[in-house]
Every structure is written in C-alpha cells, then in structure tokens.
C-alpha cells in the first residue's frame, strides 16, 4: 500500500514521525527538494544505499550525494573544508549547489566509489530540512531511472518507482526542475562538474576566480 504524505502547508507532526520512522528503519522514500524530486535513504545505512542504487539502475561507480539540514553538519562529515568550499556553502546554501569535499574517514558511510570524497548539499526546502533534522543526513539522488528525465512531481516519481517505493512526500510540483550545479572542492582549486541552477559566472563571483571545468 502506497503512503503519500502532503507537506505543502508544513508537516503534520504525525506525518513527519511516520516518514522519519520509515527512513530510520531503512526504507526508500521519495521526497521533494528545491530542484527536482529525489529518492533517498539514511546515509549511514549501507544496505539501504545499495537498494537506492539498485532502484535507480546504478552501481557503486555513481555514488549519491548527501543532503544536510545545515551548513554546520558539513563540518561534521568533512575533515578538511577548503576556503572555497566554505565560501560556496555560506553563499549558496540553502540552495541548488552541490559541493564535493574530502570525507571524514570516521563517518561510517558506504556510498560507493567516492575516492574519499562526499558530495554535499543543503536544499532550500523548509519541510525537507526539518525531515533531515529529524533523521540525519540522507543519501538522495534524483527520482528517476538512470537516463530518464527527473521527476518534478509525485506522480512522475510514482511512474518510476511504483512497486519499489511505497512512501512518498508530496509538496506539489517543484519550482524549477533544474538540477543543482556541482562543484568539486576536494582537489585544490574549484572545478565545475555540472552547470545547473547556478551559472559558472555566479560561482566565479563568489570565489574571485574562474573555476576550471571538466
């Protein structure tokens, strides 16, 4: 039986408790973000992360990013935040910027072949940040099968994951549908990996130099 919980007007406490319990128990959950809908699990649940990758049709060479409830959490999951990473987080979070940083080895996450890094983002979505505060960091990737367009509403997500996921958080259609910009700050100077909601010039303005591209 599918459970669709509406958070458009904020969380009903019982709904937040229910979704939180499902996530803590290791279940896959579809949830909104400020860009597109995502499918996610607790970042520290190894079996759930593997189930997430399988649901997407991915393997461990494509590790999911991690959503955080605050900038402060980034200091807990990374041992070495560069000046560039801090500037970007403080300027664009909460928002549609994913920042790749060196991972803290003591954090017991197995997200796949990360090369000792982790991709972090704090979404500009109050209800989702409240959920993240409840359950902790989540490994979340776009709600679609690999190679297909990402879902921008619950119905599209159900089309991809009906039978695999039975818990959906609905906040209506996403506002932009444009994925986050991805910046690698784990290997020296910042490098743009994907231009999305934020343009390269926006990043350069904050950093004071033009990032490389890859």
Regions found by a protein language model. Give the residues of each.
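Active-site-adjacent structural elements in enzyme catalytic cores
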Residues: 1-214
């Amino acid at each position: 039986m599918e459970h669709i919980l509406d958070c458009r007007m904020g969380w009903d406490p019982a709904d937040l408790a229910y979704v939180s319990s499902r996530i803590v128990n290791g279940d896959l959950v579809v949830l909104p973000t400020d860009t597109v809908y995502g499918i996610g699990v607790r970042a520290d649940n190894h079996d759930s992360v593997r189930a997430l990758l399988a649901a997407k049709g991915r393997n461990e060479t494509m590790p999911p990013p991690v959503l955080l409830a605050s900038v402060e959490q980034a200091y807990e999951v990374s041992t070495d935040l560069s000046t560039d990473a801090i500037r970007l987080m403080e300027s664009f979070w909460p928002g549609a910027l994913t920042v790749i940083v060196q991972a803290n080895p003591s954090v017991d996450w197995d997200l796949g072949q990360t090369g000792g890094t982790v991709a972090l983002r704090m979404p500009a979505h109050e209800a989702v940040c409240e959920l993240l505060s409840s359950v902790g960091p989540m490994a979340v990737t776009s709600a679609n099968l690999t190679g297909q367009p990402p879902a921008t509403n619950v119905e599209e997500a159900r089309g991809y994951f009906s039978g695999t996921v039975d818990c959906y958080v609905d906040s209506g259609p996403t506002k932009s549908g444009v994925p986050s910009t991805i910046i690698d700050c784990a290997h020296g100077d910042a490098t743009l990996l994907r231009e999305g909601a934020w343009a390269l010039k926006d990043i350069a303005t904050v950093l004071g130099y033009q990032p490389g591209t890859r």
